[in-house]
Amino acid sequence: MKQYLLGFTLVFALIACAQKGANPEQKGGDADVLNTSKTEKYLNKNLPSEAEDLVSLFNDSEIFVSKEKNKDGKYVLRAIVDTVELKGVADKNDGSEGKLEGLKPDNSKVTMSISKDQNTITIETRDSSNTKVASKVFKKDGSLTEESYKAGQLDSKKLTRSNKTTLEYSDMTNAENATTAIETLKNGIEFKGSLVGGKATLQIVESTVTLTREIDKDGKLKIYLKDTASSSKKTVSWNDTDTLTISAEGKKTKDLVFLTDGTITVQNYDSASGTTLEGTATEIKNLEALKTALK
């Protein structure tokens, strides 16, 4: 009888030990299941459901559009922007003229608007008090305009053109005035200046020569050069072919051509008469090379 009870006690002890040893593993298993569930839920947000169609937009963004209209006769839209899930509606199943919105963890609001022709997508962020903080406007031509705000007022702006050159404004007092303006062309060549009355004036200075790019409100470009030297002063002419012809002592010396892709080329005239271009135009690869061309 004692042996029977001893054996019975031993079995219970073994069961208790087994359960005790299994608990940490069980807890870990529960956590793994929970984490896996969260991951799957996040991944599922990035995929269309059976009731949705995937619509690709021009800037590599995607929206999910319901296959059927809701009770109000609208198509339901969904999108993920910087991990934030946005929801909204549109009249058409391509998402055009749709507006979506969603909240970040800090209660700031993100909205996404799609134009009627689907050529413009605007993403705007407002803080928890509904004050505008930032905006991005994507164009189908590949350009992007980014704005940031302080206390609801425009503070900085960056335009990335379709050719990937940029024009940046900072310390802005309003939409037409900025203390600092920087234009970056291909090969990292920077022109610096300011924005006054909607017109950007940007310069590169080399010794007595100042090369200026002037961009008006409509984006029209004019380039001119000023030389303060007392002798052998350089003069220039600017034409509609985006060519700046530099002359000295009454003879043409070189052409600087500002191409639409953001590059600058230089080509010299013959030194004897200054009437014939020699060789081929070469691309200016950096700021120092441009300054050399201005000498």
Swiss-Prot record:
Keywords: Cell outer membrane, Lipoprotein, Membrane, Palmitate, Plasmid, Signal. It comes from the Bacteria. Gene3D superfamilies: 3.90.930.1, C1 set domains (antibody constant domain-like) (2.40.128.160). A lipid is attached at residue 17 (S-diacylglycerol cysteine). It is a lipid-anchor. A lipid is attached at residue 17 (N-palmitoyl cysteine). GO terms for cellular component: cell outer membrane. It is found in: Cell outer membrane. The keyword Lipoprotein applies. The keyword Lipoprotein applies. Residues 1-16 form the signal peptide. It holds the Pfam family Lipoprotein_1. Changing residue 236 to A: In strain: G2. This is Outer surface protein B.
